Amino acid sequence: MQITFSPSERRRRHATQNVSESLHCRVSRQNHAADQVLPPIQKRLDDFRQQRRVQAGSLIISVFGDAVLPRGGRIWLGSLIRLLEPLELNERLIRTSVFRLAKEEWLRTEPSGRRTDYLLTPSGQRRFEEASRHIYASSAPQWDRRWRLIVTVGELAPKEREALRRALFWQGFGVIGGNFFVHPSADLSAAFDALIAEGLANLLGKLKPLLAADAQFGNAANDVDMVHGAWNLERLAGMYAEFVERYQPVLEQLRADVQVDIDGESAFLLRTLLIHDYRRLLLRDPELPDVLLPAEWPGQKARLLCKEVYRRLLPASESHLDTLFQLANGQTPEASPLLLERFREADPLA
């Protein structure tokens, strides 16, 4: 018996077959790409794809700071979607995350015909440039053996105190005794500017910035005691150790297979995750001078590791961006020569 289908049923079956074939082709391409990728790199990419919860907004911030800023700080939304799609971030999630970043005044929109560019706001660019100075630094800060203090000299409401604590935490300040925010090398002027940018200008009249030197009295507490009182370095050390454990195999494979060219897409995706993971660590790191840190501090190894992996991935990842990075008008802006200055003075990790 011959079975016949209505026109609508035939269209539905044809569409289903096309979707099935498309998915089969996509899986085949992904499997073929996986065969061409170095195993530790593939593992890192797969680990990210298998996460149940992905903070897409935070990842997009990392992409803007690392890849978009050197090309003028703007990108067509469709291009951003294509760049992040291989990490299995769907279009809806990316659009929603970018919209939220615009509401938070990190980004703004600029239409061009039927397309839209997203670009950094002046305040967003200022925050990115400040973060870049920390992320791509070649060494730990030097210390003049003086402490920077911000002392509260007026009454603060509980909500004001918590907002102040959070804002200064992201600037690297620790807390001593509730009313003293301390750091060995922070820029006090920049810290006050950051408070203004966070909408806390009304608190400045209740804060006293100070520079303090060690009076060196006999059995008094020393600088290391100050560090232990102001920061929880044990937790941070564990996070750095996890970073090293995650990316050390990647570096070893890149070193061992220097004759094998990593493909541009994998280089870009790994570079993005590398900087994303490292940036999130630095947000929690007060960036203390080496002299104040414990011996064999894992943050030092993590910095050298990040530097070398990044420099090895840079050429292939930039070639990938040359291909997929577009503005709404169809142009592909060139990367700034300053990109090559990132981690410029990095010594190889022994």
Question: Where is each model-derived feature located?
Answer:
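Short, hydrophobic-biased segments on the C-terminal half of alpha helices
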Residues: 95-99, 116, 165
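Glycine-centered, phosphate/nucleic-acid-interacting loop/turn motifs that mediate DNA/RNA or nucleotide
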Residues: 105
